[in-house]
Amino acid sequence: MLVLGLETSCDETGVALYDSERGLLADALFSQIDLHRAYGGVVPELASRDHVKRMLPLIRQTLAEADCVATDIDAIAYTAGPGLVGALLVGASCAQALAFAWDIPALGVHHMEGHLLAPMLEENPPQFPFVALLVSGGHTQLVRVDGIGQYELLGETLDDAAGEAFDKTAKMMGMQYPGGPEISKAALQGVPGRFVFPRPMTDRPGLAFSFSGLKTSALNTWQQCQSAGDDSEQTRCDIALAFQQAVVETLTIKCKRALKQTGLKSLVIAGGVSANKALRVSLESMLGELRGHVYYARPEFCTDNGAMIAFAGCQRLQAGQKEDLSISVQARWPMEQLSGL
């Protein structure tokens, strides 16, 4: 089965072709980072308009790269949520229109299920069951995964997602959008130990997260340094390092706790923050101690992309899942509502 995948949940327009027998044939991506940088964050209306502008050219590019034509495509998978409603509607409308014109099925895919399954596109994919850490700008969740659609939420953030905390902390210190990569880059020049921030909710049982207090601690420290006349680039780097260390250690502690609670030895990390090198090193070290394994997607598939949507959609389409041509998207969509295969 050859599936065309469309991703438009936020500020990346992603298109890919995935074949159930030959694997990923082609993928293309346009990032709107430069468009939104001047505003310090994603502007939903601008995001939607740019998706409209980019979608069809990217589809043509992907078909050409895979040496395919429209009649080769068996189905279309598109992101139906969660995400920005206007952006989601662009992808959904395009998918349903093409499906109607080509007389093929179209299926809405859960954005975070796409992220969760993205490591399965790699040469050494994880095997069920496993624990997944979904960590991005909008989500921080620990999920037990027994199969596609068989998800048990173990814990999630009570306030800010980890990626959101990275972005907001960077913005508070005058760094460019997106803040996550800027924090990581600055942390490389930081002096260890100059600042120490709390590891939120690690001193109590459970698998819930909270990053709003950590973000506030970083802000207060930066403002105190500014008041003392020390707002140098080195101070910014030192705070970035301390902040990143706190987030990474918090995530690692919770992942270790989830693995022990479930008795599993395999961990998948997915979502934009999974590209963070410090997080990968920390989790690999922890899994080494437990004699387990950690899996993640290649860096370009950690952020939003069409490949993960094409793959996730293909699994559900092959299992016989169908939907009509109505256009429906969801800004919020708990993964527990998904049906198992």
Curated annotation (Swiss-Prot):
Q: Which residues bind substrate?
A: 134-138, 167, 180, 276
Database matches in InterPro entries: ATPase_NBD, Gcp-like_dom, KAE1/TsaD, TsaD
Location in the cell reads: Cytoplasm
One Pfam family in the UniProt entry? TsaD
Among its keywords, does the record have ATP-binding? no
Catalysed reaction(s)?
A: L-threonylcarbamoyladenylate + adenosine(37) in tRNA = N(6)-L-threonylcarbamoyladenosine(37) in tRNA + AMP + H(+)
Relate the protein's function as given in its record: Required for the formation of a threonylcarbamoyl group on adenosine at position 37 (t(6)A37) in tRNAs that read codons beginning with adenine. Is involved in the transfer of the threonylcarbamoyl moiety of threonylcarbamoyl-AMP (TC-AMP) to the N6 group of A37, together with TsaE and TsaB. TsaD likely plays a direct catalytic role in this reaction.
Family in the record? Belongs to the KAE1 / TsaD family.
The record's annotation in HAMAP family points to: TsaD
What is the protein name for this chain? tRNA N6-adenosine threonylcarbamoyltransferase
Organism, scientific name: Pseudomonas syringae pv. tomato (strain ATCC BAA-871 / DC3000)
Instruction: Provide the gene name from the record.
Output: tsaD
